[in-house]
């Protein structure tokens, strides 16, 4: 199973905002046994977003998660781009509109805003691609969307980290299933990653594992993450590498 992630926002490209969403989504997908093959960041432009969505769909991922650009402002255009990419029209989601209305009325009652009126900017967030299943935003206003398209499960989530994390946990992860999978972290006692590389390559050829290495500066250790379908396979891979003269400490 493989997945791709698209994050949307000019602020991500200018460096004004750290793209923590992509790291969080990738970690959650990896924990579910998905191989995240690509993370793409794109600005707030309809055609640019449409283009990267189509590029991703051409690679036929099992899951595509898009985050950002669902708010009420002029540059929140992700739903428009998704609809264009899929050849669908945007339609009003009445349930979403009611939830948005209730959200702003609650903020008004709490004294956080001075006007709960559903103006055009707020109504805009209730439009989803035709046929999409709305995803409830339990901590914010903008709903997300779930669309199955030619074998790919597409999820469109808000860009605000708190909203994205809640929707990911409550609406996305229950829909994507998981694959049995184990990951273990080790510190390899070797100072030169180039000397470790051929041993890792040989290990991957022999055992059904994926291995990521992460040098810890020019110190004594190199961080290793090993992924496999069961812990026994990881143990065998580690023992093999130990037989090549590499010592390991579990954990980082």
Curated annotation (Swiss-Prot):
InterPro entries: CinA, CinA_Arc, MoaB/Mog-like_dom_sf, MoaB/Mog_dom. Coiled coil: none annotated. SMART domains: MoCF_biosynth. Transmembrane segments: none annotated. It holds the Pfam family MoCF_biosynth. Belongs to the CinA family. This is Protein PF0476. It comes from Pyrococcus furiosus (strain ATCC 43587 / DSM 3638 / JCM 8422 / Vc1).
């Amino acid at each position: 199973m493989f997945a791709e992630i698209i994050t949307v926002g000019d602020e991500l490209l200018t460096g004004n905002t750290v793209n923590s969403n992509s790291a969080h989504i990738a970690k959650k997908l990896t924990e579910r046994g998905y191989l995240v093959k690509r993370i793409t960041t794109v600005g707030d432009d309809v055609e640019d977003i449409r283009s990267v969505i189509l590029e991703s769909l051409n690679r036929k991922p099992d899951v595509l998660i898009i985050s950002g650009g669902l708010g009420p402002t002029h540059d929140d255009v992700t739903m428009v781009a998704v609809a264009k990419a899929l050849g669908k029209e945007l339609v009003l989601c009445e349930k979403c509109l009611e939830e948005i209305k209730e959200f702003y009325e609650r903020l008004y009652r709490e004294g956080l805003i001075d006007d709960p009126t559903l103006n055009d900017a707020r109504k805009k967030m209730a439009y989803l691609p035709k046929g999409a299943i709305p995803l409830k935003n339990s901590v914010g206003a903008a709903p997300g969307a779930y669309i199955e398209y030619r074998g790919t499960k597409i999820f469109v989530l808000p860009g605000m980290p708190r909203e994205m994390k809640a929707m990911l946990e409550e609406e996305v992860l229950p829909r994507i299933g998981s694959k049995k999978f184990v990951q273990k972290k080790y510190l390899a006692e070797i100072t030169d990653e180039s000397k470790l590389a051929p041993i890792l390559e040989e290990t991957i050829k022999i055992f059904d594992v994926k291995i990521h290495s992460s040098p810890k500066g020019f110190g004594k250790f190199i961080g290793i993450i090993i992924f496999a379908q069961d812990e026994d396979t990881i143990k065998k891979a580690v023992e093999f590498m130990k037989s090549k003269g590499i010592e390991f400490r579990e954990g980082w």
